[in-house]
Amino acid sequence: MDPAREAAYEAVAAVHRDDAYANLVLPRILRESGVSGRDAAFATELTYGTLRQTGTLDAIVAAAADRPVDRIDPPVRDALRVGAYQLLHMRVGAHAAVATTVDLVRSLVPGAAGFANAVLRRIAEADRSGWLARLAPADPVARAALTHAHPEWIVRAFVDALGSLDEAELALDADNLPPPVHLCARPGLLDPADLAAALAGAAVGRYSPYAVVLTGGGDPGAVPAVRDGRAHVQDEGSQLVAAALAGALLDARDDTWLDLCAGPGGKAGLLGAVAV
């Protein structure tokens, strides 16, 4: 078994099976499996790329398998997603992508190895553009949803908000770009400039007063300030939400605030640190 590919599969499976957060589960999997350096970078791209492209990958897997993806055993389905991403999005040879994925499926569901081999070989017969041309719906919005791996309702919402499908597709393209890793220097415990100066390939964020961006990549869990609790991983946009709320002028009313992007508590934790 290839450790990097196995780590990526485990992270993808955890997201779909357990509603796990990839940014939380993947670093733990990499550490526990001893995957580091270039192998960790490969596993990271494979994990996040597979998750970003799941909608399109599922359409291609379903066509190659001649069945809906919800009729494929979940472990096999996730392995096929990981294999298909390598075939269609990464500079990985078809033989390596197929062979390693079949080995993975054999370790998960031995009886499904032949099925996986057939599906992946069928996928490898065309590149991504070829598959999109073959599967493209007539409806422009549905076609954009397939091309950009977004649900149709999101594409329609973008069109409504931006006024045209062309503008919406630019936003969808941007939404699929791999985001940089941001750290949040916890107020009162660490200055962002000091954190950035202590790390190679790091810079103070552009917008949040607490942000540091890891421009050189790497495992944020290995950062001493993250390990000792003076910083944590948090997207700069999420930090801005907390900063905006912390600076909001409140009148005498008992206002209620609704977080429509609630997760594991990053914004709430930052608000607590600001309030101390």
In which residue ranges do the predicted regions lie?
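Rossmann-like S-adenosyl-L-methionine
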Residues: 194-276
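Class I Rossmann-like S-adenosyl-L-methionine
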Residues: 1-222
